[in-house]
Amino acid sequence: MNPNQRIITIGSVSLTIAAMCFFMQIAILIITVTLHFKQYECNSPPKNNQVTLCEPTIIERNTTEIVYMTNTTIEKEVCPKLAEYRNWSKPQCKITGFAPFSKDNSIRLSAGGDIWVTREPYVSCDPNKCYQFALGQGTTLNNRHSNDTIHDRTPYRTLLMNELGVPFHLGTKQVCIAWSSSSCHDGKAWLHVCVTGHDENATASIIYDGRLVDSIGSWSKKILRTQESECVCINETCTVVMTDGSASGRADTKVLFIEEGKIVHISPLSGSAQHVEECSCYPRYPDVRCVCRDNWKGSNRPIVDINVKDYSIVSSYVCSGLVGDTPRKNDRSSSSNCLNPNNEEGGHGVKGWAFDDGNDVWIGRTISETLRSGYETFKVIEGWSKPNSKLQTNRQVIVDRGNRSGYSGIFSVEGKSCINRCFYVELIRGRKQETEVWWTSNSIVVFCGTSGTYGTGSWPDGADINLMPI
C-alpha cells in the first residue's frame, strides 16, 4: 500500500469513528433529556388523587474522546417514600436492662460558652431521628438574667428543640412560648402542646407542622399543665394528658385527643387514681399507657390507660411494693395494692416513669428516698400484676447517690421488629441546693433498652460548681 492509500485509509477509519461517536452523543443527549422529564413527573404530586408509582431509574453518563469512550458514573434516583401515620403495632422489645445512649453535658459547657438555662427536659423521636426538648428560661447561663431562674412559670420561658446530643446553644430553635409542654411526631409532622400565661387562666396552644391549629384555655383556673415528656400518636390520633387544679389536693385531669393539631375529643379522668400529673406515656397498641405522678396521696405511681378508638379512660396504680416516687418510705415499709394511693409520703413528688413487661414492671427512680439524688433502674417480678410485689432484679445505677438527679421520663423508638423503651434523667444543678450560684439549670443523660449485656458506671452532670458563672 503506497503512502497516499495509507493516508486515505487512516482518514476513512478516523472519520467513521468520529461519526459513530457523534451519533452516540446525540442518543445519550436524547436519553438524558427524557429521563430528566420523567424525574420531574415522578416528583410532582399525583393528579386527581391518583397514585403515582415511582421506580428506581438508572442514568448512564458517557465521556467520549476521539479514540476511546469510557463509562464513568451510574446513579440511582429513588422517589421519596410517602409519609404514613405511625401505629406502633410492633411488639415491645425484650430487654435485659439499659445501655448508655446520649449525654449533652450542658452545664459543663456553660462554663465557657453560651448555653441556655433550662429545666423540664425530655426526648422524642420522629421516624428517622431523635430530638431533645426543654423549657428554656429566656436566657443563657452566663447572663445576669439567669439570676433567680428557679421559678417554674414566667412569660419568657419557651420550648427548645435540638437534635439529641446537641446542647441548647444560641442557634437553638424556640418552638413555642411555654412553661409546660409535650411533643410527639405522628409520622407526618410534629405536634407540640405549649402552655403559657397567667397561673389562674393559662392557654395551651396546639401547634402542628409549624402552625398554630387549635388552643384550649384553663378549665379550673389553677395552673393548667401537661406531661413534660412526649405524647403518643396511634395512627392519626395523638393523646395528651393535662391537669388543672390543686397540686396538693383534688385536681381536674383530662385527656385531649388531637388529630393534625385539632382537638377532636376531650375525656375526663376516670378510675381509681386520685391525683395525676406529669405523665410519662408510651404506645401499647392499639392503646396508650401512662405512668404518672400523684402529688397528693401516693408515693406509688398512678397508671392511666387510654383507649384511642372509643376515648375511654381507666386509671389505677402500679402494683409494685417497691414504689417509684420521691419522697417515699424505705423499701421494707413501702406498699401498693394496685388500686389506690398508698398514703405514704404522698405529698410532693417528682416526675418519673415505669413500663409493663408482661406481668413484670421496669421502674426508674431516685436512689435517695427523700431527695432528688442518685438514680437507679430495676425490674420487679410480677410488679405489674401482683399487689405489693417486691422481688427486684436487674438493678442498675445510672447516677450515684452522691450526685443530683431530677425529673425523668420515657420515650419509645421503633426498630425493625420491635419497639424499644428508652428514658432520660434530668440532672439539675444550681439553686436551691447549690447556693454558690444564683441560677437553676440542668443537663441530661439518656439510656435505652438492650437485649445484650452491659457493665456498670455512674453518669452525673459532672460540672464543678466553683468553676461556673455565678
Regions found by a protein language model. Name each.
Residues 4-36:
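Single-pass membrane-anchoring alpha-helices
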Residues 108, 189-192, 239-241, 288-289, ...:
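Short beta-strand elements that form the blades of beta-propeller/WD-repeat-like
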Residues 192-197, 425-426, 436, 469:
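Short tryptophan-centered beta-strand motifs in secreted/extracellular beta-sheet-rich domains
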Residues 77, 290-292:
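Extracellular cysteine-rich, disulfide-stabilized repeat modules
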Residues 100-110, 348-355:
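Short carbohydrate-recognition loop motifs
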Residues 117, 131-133, 193, 376-386, ...:
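Short hydrophobic/aromatic patches on beta-strands that form ligand-binding or substrate-lining surfaces
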